[in-house]
Amino acid sequence: PVDAQGVVRSGTGSGAVRGPELNTRLVVSLAGCMALCIGFASALETDQYYAWGRPLADSTDAVNARFNLELERAIASFPADRQPENCRKVAVAYRKRMRFLLLHEIQVWAWNSEWVDRIPNGADEQREYRRTNLYSNHPLLDTGTWMPYTPTLEVAGVRFGTDKLAHLVSSGWTYYGEYRKGLKKGETPEDAERRAVNRGITEESLILGKLASGVTSIPDLEANYAGMHFYLDLCDVDDPILKLGAAGWFISRPVDLRDYVTPRWDESYQPPLYTKGRWRKVKPVLETYCDRLADPQVVEMRRRYREMDRGSLVGDMVAERVAEGKIQDPAQFSIEAVCSEPDPSREGAPKIADRIEIVSSQADDATVMEKVVAEDEDRRRFALGLAGLHITYPLVASASIAVMVTTQPST
């Protein structure tokens, strides 16, 4: 059994190409490029060990405010006299507001909002982070590290990379669709959930993780699974978040990330899987964090995580694959496995509490919402053109162009 620390419990011809053959090759090439781009974007790496021992304010209220603000805007996008009869249409509008093809809106917001505390934060910290983080030791042509590293934030008492918010709203929708497909095929809700998680494990083991960066992130899978329940809660449960009243759709209860975040989103608690090549680069850096295991903040946090951890379907299914020999045991990639020192957080742990109370960094939800709205209105949106040229021996050149939509403060 695997515990929570380790988890879980082409052609060679010459000449011109014409007609249908050219079209076929073009379509295949474009599809391949899109898959790789999406894979690289999904392979944004994060390092929670870097934040160990560093103070970080809980940003639950700010993140909740953003999620609820976008839901309000999704509802408002429909004319008052032409409200959709189907709740799922509102959910689709919400999903479109939260995600994008590569870097998702909610993640970019978390990177930049003054109301979200994060590590690293500021140019100097970011430079240090790129130089010393868990994935800093990599070859120049390591495409898996070309995308930006994601900072750590804290929500519901759990530290995780901002990429998990993107997984929640993006891959969570994919899981939701797979779940509904299973139900339509006559599967039980339990089997439909397993169908969705199984697809996610397969994708993360291939283009979205292992092939793109040499990392199979189980915390990403946990965020994906939570995202499925996030979308189910909008319309498909007995007490949905969205309800239809006389004046149209309204939020019956606010979105609360406390319902979805678990300690298994923290990659220092639930380690990913690595390919041999990636592990050779990661392990020496991981060993430099061993002395932080005894840091009082780290000891308290890891004890608290174990109290909060109630297991998960993702953990169960990963453990099944480990037992079948289909994937590696994540325990071998944990900090406990590489450090000679014992983990102090396992010694003399206090009695598990019946309920973990989370004290947020902000007390007045309405005030936080107002601040998030004001910040959003003070930003201007614009597009940047990006161009690149790559030359390799012998005499092979490739070029790329792209447009990045971004924002910056107006004042």
Locate the predicted segments by residue.
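Compositionally biased, intrinsically disordered low-complexity segments enriched in Pro/Arg/Gln/His
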Residues: 5, 9, 18-20
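Generic short amphipathic/hydrophobic targeting helices enriched at N-termini
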Residues: 3-4, 13, 23-24, 34, ...
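Extended rod-forming repeat segments used as scaffolds/tethers
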Residues: 10-12, 30, 371, 377-378
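Bacterial N-terminal signal peptides that target proteins for export
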Residues: 17-30
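Serine residues within intrinsically disordered or low-complexity segments
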Residues: 10, 14, 29, 398-400, ...
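Active-site glycine-rich loop that binds ribose-phosphate moieties when present
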Residues: 201-204
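Intrinsically disordered, low-complexity, mixed-charge
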Residues: 42-198, 208-221, 225-386, 393-407
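Bacterial N-terminal signal peptides
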Residues: 29-37
